A protein has these predicted regions:
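Phosphate- and other anionic-substrate recognition elements at nucleic-acid/protein interfaces
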Residues: 2-169
Length: 169
């Protein structure tokens, strides 16, 4: 992470979480570097949309903040697509999800983020509802489950990769 050019400038960390699929969840969070929880609500955005729309929304967000010198750290967590024996891991939707994991990862890298692709099984046990709530992310209805899964990846990346404070610490 770099230091802002102005000595009194606020240093921000931008974290993004993505749960790719036919319905994609995105979570955008900005942290005052090393700041405390809960994060003010205006610094947390949860989005759920079709994968193509979500890709365009993310690109617009990244372009808007590209070059913002206050953002000294950019991390992202993208949920990996794990192939298994269930019906959801084969067929057209599975192929699209695999493609979108790569498309989102490439887009994030293009805008200076350091995305890590992780399995849900590695993130979910740590990113509990209690931890999300303490971080300022309220419980979501089932219809928003993809954005909530994205929030898990976002918070995990912020704490594990950008060394932000654990909300439960």
């Amino acid at each position: 992470m770099t230091t802002p050019k102005h000595p009194n400038a606020v240093s921000l960390v931008s974290a993004i979480g993505i749960d790719p699929g036919p319905t994609t969840g995105i979570c955008l969070m900005e942290f005052i570097n090393g700041g405390a929880y809960p994060i003010p609500e205006h610094n947390i955005t949860l989005i759920q949309a079709s994968s193509g729309t979500a890709l365009r929304v993310l690109e617009a967000y990244l372009a808007h903040f590209y070059g913002d010198e206050r953002i000294t750290g950019r991390v992202a967590g993208v949920e990996a697509f794990v192939t298994g024996q269930s019906a959801g891991t084969r067929g057209k939707n599975a192929d699209l999800t695999r493609q979108y994991v790569m498309k989102f990862t490439e887009l994030l890298e293009l805008f200076g983020y350091y995305p890590k692709v992780r399995k849900a099984a590695d993130v979910k046990p740590w990113a509990t509802d209690k931890r999300l709530l303490r971080a300022g992310i309220p419980k979501q209805p089932d219809s928003m489950r993809h954005s909530l899964d994205a929030a898990r990846h976002c918070l995990y990346a912020a704490v594990k990769d950008a060394h932000q404070k654990d909300p439960l610490a």
